[in-house]
């Protein structure tokens, strides 16, 4: 199976400026992500950035970097530019890995690529079961429901499916585990251009979830339970401190 990993990395971050270059045990965060992705068996791992500081650091550790426009409105537009600049064939599988996940397991990068290769969908992603009831009601924990074949029916920040009877009886809503979506995607490269030429849908604007555009226009997204539950990404200084402690062991 052939696939390419693209890792978007932006310097600007509201809560943690310069996040991709944050030092973690002697290496910048983006290098940790790059090295994890490189263990997944991809043909190529590319870091996409619009910042010369990140470009210089990536070249310094021997990584493959593609400079992109600073004017993209979404990460998907950035992917399209990388696919075009790097000459990635339309039938190639591209896995988008977030640049703030230094602990991402290589196994799930390969898993989502293989799931796409084995499916009829133009796009695939992963989920994990929700074990904590607080996540059921947390709008930042995006829920997903699928059909019998593992294709997404809907993604929502609300609690879906809603167990009416369990709620009425005061029972735990995790008895029949909900699925929490995790932010890793695999695409057939040619589908990216199709996607960015669609107008944003009403549903994605309401939920603030880009992937709903795919379902709105009648395409499929394959969803599987991740073989390994990934650690949380780095959004804050507290997150960064936790990752440093883990990798220092």
From Swiss-Prot:
Coiled coil: none annotated. One of its GO terms (molecular function) is 3-deoxy-manno-octulosonate cytidylyltransferase activity. The keyword Glycoprotein does not apply. It catalyses: 3-deoxy-alpha-D-manno-oct-2-ulosonate + CTP = CMP-3-deoxy-beta-D-manno-octulosonate + diphosphate. GO terms for biological process: CMP-keto-3-deoxy-D-manno-octulosonic acid biosynthetic process; lipopolysaccharide biosynthetic process. Its EC number is 2.7.7.38. It is found in: Cytoplasm. Its main location: cytoplasm. GO terms for cellular component: cytosol. It comes from the Bacteria. Keywords: Cytoplasm, Lipopolysaccharide biosynthesis, Nucleotidyltransferase, Transferase. The keyword Cell inner membrane does not apply. Pathway: Nucleotide-sugar biosynthesis; CMP-3-deoxy-D-manno-octulosonate biosynthesis; CMP-3-deoxy-D-manno-octulosonate from 3-deoxy-D-manno-octulosonate and CTP: step 1/1; Bacterial outer membrane biogenesis; lipopolysaccharide biosynthesis. Activates KDO (a required 8-carbon sugar) for incorporation into bacterial lipopolysaccharide in Gram-negative bacteria. Belongs to the KdsB family. This is 3-deoxy-manno-octulosonate cytidylyltransferase.
């Amino acid at each position: 199976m052939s696939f390419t990993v693209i890792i978007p990395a932006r310097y600007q971050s509201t809560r943690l400026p310069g996040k991709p270059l944050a030092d973690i045990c002697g290496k910048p965060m983006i290098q940790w992500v790059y090295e994890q992705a490189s263990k997944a068996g991809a043909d190529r791992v590319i870091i996409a950035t619009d910042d010369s500081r990140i470009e210089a650091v990536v070249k310094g550790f021997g990584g493959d970097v593609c400079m992109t426009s600073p004017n993209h409105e979404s990460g998907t537009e950035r992917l399209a530019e990388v696919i075009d600049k790097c000459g990635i064939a339309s039938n190639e599988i591209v896995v988008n890995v977030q640049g703030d996940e230094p602990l991402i397991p290589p196994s799930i990068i390969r898993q989502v690529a293989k799931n796409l290769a084995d499916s009829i969908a133009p796009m695939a992603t992963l989920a994990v079961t929700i074990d904590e009831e607080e996540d059921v009601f947390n709008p930042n924990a995006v829920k997903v429901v699928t059909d019998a074949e593992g294709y997404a029916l809907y993604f929502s920040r609300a609690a879906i499916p809603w167990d009416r009877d369990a709620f009425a009886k005061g029972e735990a809503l995790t008895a029949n585990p909900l699925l929490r979506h995790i932010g890793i995607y695999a695409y057939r490269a040619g589908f990216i251009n199709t996607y960015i030429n669609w107008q944003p849908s009403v549903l994605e604007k309401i939920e603030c979830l880009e992937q709903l555009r795919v379902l709105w226009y009648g395409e499929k997204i394959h969803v599987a339970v991740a073989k390994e539950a990934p650690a949380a990404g780095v959004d804050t200084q507290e997150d960064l401190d936790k990752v440093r402690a883990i990798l220092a062991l």
